[in-house]
């Protein structure tokens, strides 16, 4: 096959490209320039896509003897990932920028350009696997290295995108083996640290970064009855499940600690309550996709596992596509309550190791009655109350 290897400058993508060459494919390397000011995108081991990373990728490509290019995707990345991240937070939702990048950049803009240029597939260093299904169609599966599995952040891929994706690291037992292989091949980045968190916020100060862009306005902290029990200096400074730093002047009647349950940008309030009020018994959303043929017909429930964070444990659940409030939604009911779930997060559904699809969460239903004041759903077009807990996930390579 003619393969376009996306090379981030890290060890995973370098070894993935090397394995593609070993497999006899016609490989070309490409590094994505995602910022016009790449020096701002790294602090120590945090961040990615800097000039240093581009040079590391070029050196790896030269070692492998493959052509190498740098493509400027900075404008598309700013519009589809960074601006989306800010807009979602302003709407009180919890975006996952790594999934947006996979959905709109690596397996959309990059893949589209690759196919236009005659490539058969895009190769990345993600820890996931593409395997043939019973009908011969490619399926997206978890990686053999469960601790490094990145199938969650690839859950946004459609069947067509999966058919043009190549993940050579999928069957690798561990990251240590990848590093050892890189060292044996003479790849200079064999011991380069993994990138973490959000690449365009390399210092990890998401609250400060957001405050610089959306401002910080004081507002009320509410209890479950809607009573104002304190004030905050900016809702973006809080995350769902947070306990420390609430600075509540009125203690709880039962003396128990309180946790952030929701952030409500429409009226600039933060709702707090007991820890058990974080439990969620149902999630749903209208923005869903399937990684192949839908598992059932609409209104026909199916068993699955649901995962709501990149490295969270999957939870057994029942799911169905149903009409809710006039729109088709994927509704998921976990066997046991989920905790700290926020609108804007992504729920990926699995059948064993296979990714079935995903949904962006618009609505959550508390497992605890009367735990919060009345709320409105936070759909994509409505900046309504919602939680704003940031879910960090490594971006993959």
Curated annotation (Swiss-Prot):
Organism ancestry: Bacteria, Bacillati, Actinomycetota, Actinomycetes, Micrococcales
Site note Interaction with tRNA, residues: 126, 345
Disulfide cysteine pairs (residue numbers): 101-199
Keyword set includes Transferase: yes
Entry's family note: Belongs to the MnmA/TRMU family.
InterPro entries: MnmA-like, MnmA-like_C, MnmA-like_central, MnmA-like_central_sf, Rossmann-like_a/b/a_fold
Cell location: Cytoplasm
SUPFAM superfamilies: Adenine nucleotide alpha hydrolases-like (SSF52402)
Name of the protein described by the UniProt record: tRNA-specific 2-thiouridylase MnmA
UniProt KW keywords: ATP-binding, Cytoplasm, Disulfide bond, Nucleotide-binding, RNA-binding, Transferase, tRNA processing, tRNA-binding
Binding site for ATP: 6-13, 32, 125
Catalysed reactions listed for this entry: S-sulfanyl-L-cysteinyl-[protein] + uridine(34) in tRNA + AH2 + ATP = 2-thiouridine(34) in tRNA + L-cysteinyl-[protein] + A + AMP + diphosphate + H(+)
Organism of provenance: Clavibacter sepedonicus (Clavibacter michiganensis subsp. sepedonicus)
Top EC class, one word: transferase
Function: Catalyzes the 2-thiolation of uridine at the wobble position (U34) of tRNA, leading to the formation of s(2)U34.
Annotated GO MF terms: ATP binding; tRNA binding; tRNA-uridine 2-sulfurtransferase activity
Pfam families in UniProt: tRNA_Me_trans, tRNA_Me_trans_C, tRNA_Me_trans_M
Primary location group: cytoplasm
GO biological process, one term: tRNA wobble position uridine thiolation
Region of interest: Interaction with tRNA: 148-150
């Amino acid at each position: 096959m003619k393969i376009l290897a996306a090379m981030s400058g890290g060890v995973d993508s370098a070894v993935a490209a090397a394995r593609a060459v070993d497999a006899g494919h016609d490989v070309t390397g490409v590094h994505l320039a995602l910022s016009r000011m790449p020096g701002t995108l790294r602090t120590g081991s945090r961040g990615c896509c800097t000039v240093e990373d581009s040079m590391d990728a070029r050196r790896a490509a030269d070692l492998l003897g493959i052509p190498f290019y740098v493509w400027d995707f900075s404008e598309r990345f700013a519009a589809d990932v960074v601006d989306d991240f800010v807009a979602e937070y302003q709407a009180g939702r919890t975006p996952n920028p790594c999934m947006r990048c996979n959905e709109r950049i690596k397996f959309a803009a990059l893949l589209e350009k690759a196919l236009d240029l005659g490539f058969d597939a895009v190769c990345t260093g993600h820890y996931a696997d593409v395997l043939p299904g019973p009908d011969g169609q490619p399926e997206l599966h978890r990686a053999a290295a469960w601790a490094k599995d990145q199938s969650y952040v690839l859950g946004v891929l459609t069947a067509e995108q999966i058919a043009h994706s190549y993940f050579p690291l999928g069957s690798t037992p561990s990251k240590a083996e990848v590093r050892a292989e890189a060292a044996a091949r003479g790849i200079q980045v064999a011991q380069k640290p993994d990138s973490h968190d959000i690449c365009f916020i390399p210092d990890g100060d998401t609250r400060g970064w957001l405050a610089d862009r959306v401002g910080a306005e004081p507002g009320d902290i509410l209890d479950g009855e809607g009573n104002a029990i304190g004030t905050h200096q900016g809702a973006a400074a809080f995350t769902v499940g947070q306990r420390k730093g609430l600075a509540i002047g009125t203690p709880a009647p039962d003396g128990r600690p309180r946790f952030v349950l929701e952030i409500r940008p429409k009226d600039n309030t933060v709702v707090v309550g007991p820890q058990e009020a974080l439990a969620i018994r149902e999630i749903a959303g209208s923005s869903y996709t399937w990684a192949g043929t839908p598992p059932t017909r609409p209104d026909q429930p199916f068993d699955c596992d649901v995962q709501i964070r990149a490295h969270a444990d999957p939870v057994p659940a029942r799911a169905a596509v149903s009409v809710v409030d006039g729109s088709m939604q994927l509704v998921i009911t976990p066997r046991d309550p989920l905790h700290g779930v926020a609108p804007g997060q992504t729920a990926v559904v699995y059948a064993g190791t296979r990714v079935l699809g995903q949904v962006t969460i618009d609505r959550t239903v508390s497992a605890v009655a009367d735990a919060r004041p009345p709320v409105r759903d936070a759909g994509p077009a409505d900046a309504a109350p919602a939680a704003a807990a940031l879910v960090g996930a490594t971006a993959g390579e």
